[in-house]
């Protein structure tokens, strides 16, 4: 199994090719020579792949352009003669960010200030006489205040100060240091007001009237369409979690090259795990399974899905067209054509919108950082024990914590719409925090490189070494 991925600037000359050769990315090849290891053993990606040149981010990373000409070349000539980049224009392999609309919260009520009883002494045709003004002031007097029209202003201020001290009963002995805010200490979760997120009835895409019912349906559906959490130990004999992670890392690059939407990637991983939960497979056919699952997901999500020949090409024609179609039929039959499955991306889109309603963090930083954390979770086999909605909520929690380490990441609005308390997110947040801090590994660079690009640039965010335990305590009334 191999995926040749020439550099985007290969047709530009030998100088560009030499510069691209300095940075190499290995893709998948036949891994029959890899000895079976423990489930958590680390595999060097060099045993999976042949070296492939890789261009810089500025010129577009490993872009597969001009699909039609590539497919014709793949079908008319043998694999070694295929060249898809000799005359193809370059394009940037970055999925455009999807900026969510932010529904502004209700503005605070204006503060009413009592009108002054003084009238401007300027003479004009519309001015009010002093007698009329005095009569109006007399009729508007309140029994709680003493109005002095011509008296000394100092006596008025003294009277008001005495009344304020009596009513408020301000103690001069109060310790001010106890109320002093400490910037270094994490703030506890407070009982705040729940913001209305579903109040925009003009945009039909937001489905304001049905949003709550849709969320409840997705929460119910995720329990029925989840993969097994122990299929590596009970079903698979020749495949381990490290091989699964390398396959998903390669699929991330394929999705980037063909500019597939993020939902396609999440669905692909869901199909792979569900199929592996009930079918034993050897390592020679693992990449074939990944390609077939991405083909199914692309047909479901994409407007213009890549053709079968393009997926054959991306594997360096390791598999024939009939083999891909045969595996596609096998996956669909096992899934009983139930290809609609809630993923972490489905919930994350909703949770990001909820978090942005009353959040002070930059909207794009929060969105990109939460998406980066959620995509990292795809590589980790052990995180299959958490439902997608919990992973999405934990990604929001961790992203908000990274952006503002001293502020409580959770609030009443997020707890209401996600239906998760901060204490329920503790284990998953800690697992994601370790994954974010340590990283997926040098042999799994695709996701980190994707979110290091200048349009996102959140993969190198500084993360505190630990999450304070106070943040996982539920708020009490």
Swiss-Prot record:
Keywords: Cell cycle, Cell division, Cyclin. InterPro entries: Cyclin (IPR039361), Cyclin-like_dom (IPR013763), Cyclin-like_sf (IPR036915), Cyclin_A/B-like (IPR046965), Cyclin_C-dom (IPR004367), Cyclin_N (IPR006671), Cyclins_cyclin-box (IPR048258). Disulfide bonds: none annotated. The keyword Nucleotide-binding does not apply. One of its GO terms (molecular function) is cyclin-dependent protein serine/threonine kinase regulator activity. CDD domains: CYCLIN_AtCycA-like_rpt2, CYCLIN_AtCycA_like_rpt1. GO terms for biological process: cell division; G1/S transition of mitotic cell cycle. Signal peptide: none annotated. Pfam families: Cyclin_C (PF02984), Cyclin_N (PF00134). GO terms for cellular component: cyclin-dependent protein kinase holoenzyme complex; cytoplasm; nucleus. Belongs to the cyclin family. Cyclin AB subfamily. This is Cyclin-A1-2.
